[in-house]
């Protein structure tokens, strides 16, 4: 299921539009690149616009979480993105079919792979794992720094 990038709420003086994105994949590597592109597209519409480093951090977090879902869970995975009010943070929700909680492996600079959750922990906050009827949902919040103006 593909829900295109769009504004879901009406802009009023008291409440700005909420930017959201959601997508479900059957899994696979192509979903990772699409997820990174979705982050960039969504944040390009955020106001105030986040600085480039914040966009890259958000793309890395999403890439790691979607990679974990595609690698460790059989079946489809879903991605939800929501720019929080004032464009100060991006909420990221990744859902997959595995009931296994994500696990951080002990750091080992000689190991290839297995560093994704460490990166997520460095760049995001409020990591929460819940178990809906089928699988799990991982939610994090990535802080966004507004781009300097002038």
Residue ranges and their predicted role:
Residues 1-26, 70-150:
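Conserved beta-strand-loop-beta-strand hairpin that lines the nucleotide-binding pocket
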Residues 17-37, 41:
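Short beta-to-alpha transition helix within the HATPase_c
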Residues 1, 14-16, 30, 34, ...:
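Polar low-complexity intrinsically disordered regions
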Residues 61, 66-72:
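Short, well-structured hydrophobic secondary-structure segments
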Residues 37-63:
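Conserved short strand/loop->alpha-helix "switch" segment adjacent to the catalytic nucleotide/phosphoryl-transfer site
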């Amino acid at each position: 299921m593909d829900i295109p990038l769009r504004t879901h709420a009406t802009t009023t003086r008291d409440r700005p539009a909420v930017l959201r994105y959601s997508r479900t994949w059957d899994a696979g590597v192509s979903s990772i690149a699409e997820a990174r592109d979705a982050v960039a597209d969504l944040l390009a519409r955020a106001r105030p616009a986040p600085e480039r480093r914040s966009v890259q951090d958000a793309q890395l977090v999403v890439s790691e979480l979607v990679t974990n879902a595609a690698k460790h869970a059989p079946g489809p995975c879903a991605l939800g993105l929501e720019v929080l009010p004032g464009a100060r943070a991006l909420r990221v929700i990744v859902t997959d079919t595995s009931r296994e909680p994500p696990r951080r492996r002990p750091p080992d600079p000689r190991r290839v792979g297995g560093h994704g959750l460490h990166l997520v922990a460095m760049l995001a906050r409020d990591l929460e794992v819940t178990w809906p009827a089928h699988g799990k949902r991982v939610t994090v919040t990535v802080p966004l720094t507004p781009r300097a103006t002038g």
